[in-house]
């Protein structure tokens, strides 16, 4: 009962052509191909997300805590003081 032969496929193709028309059929096939490509990439992404989960659980295991790391001494950056520009066209009145 579940066997689809050549005559059935021809009937299905004719029904699709009648429903969509010959002009819209290439666009529909292109859209279907894009949708399948996106679907496959999302499924692959789900499988890739599931694989690293066990290694993350191992990395999250508690480790020996030795205390806070010593802070490095704070030295302010040495910068030369800004010198005002001389001459030029300023808004000073003489």
Curated annotation (Swiss-Prot):
GO terms for biological process: protein transport by the Tat complex. GO terms for cellular component: TAT protein transport complex. Residues 52-69 have a biased composition (Low complexity). Residues 70-79 have a biased composition (Pro residues). GO terms for molecular function: protein transmembrane transporter activity. Its main location: membrane. It is a single-pass membrane protein. Part of the twin-arginine translocation (Tat) system that transports large folded proteins containing a characteristic twin-arginine motif in their signal peptide across membranes. TatA could form the protein-conducting channel of the Tat system. Belongs to the TatA/E family. This is Sec-independent protein translocase protein TatA. It comes from Frankia casuarinae (strain DSM 45818 / CECT 9043 / HFP020203 / CcI3). The gene is tatA.
């Amino acid at each position: 009962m579940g066997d689809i032969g050549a005559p059935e496929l021809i009937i299905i193709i004719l029904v699709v052509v009648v429903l969509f028309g010959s002009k819209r059929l290439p666009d529909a096939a292109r859209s279907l191909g894009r949708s399948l490509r996106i679907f496959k990439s999302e499924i692959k992404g789900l499988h890739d997300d599931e694989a690293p989960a066990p290694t993350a659980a191992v990395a999250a295991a508690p480790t020996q805590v030795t205390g806070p790391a010593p802070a490095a001494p704070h030295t302010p950056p040495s910068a030369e003081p800004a010198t005002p520009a001389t001459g030029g066209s300023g808004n000073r009145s003489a």
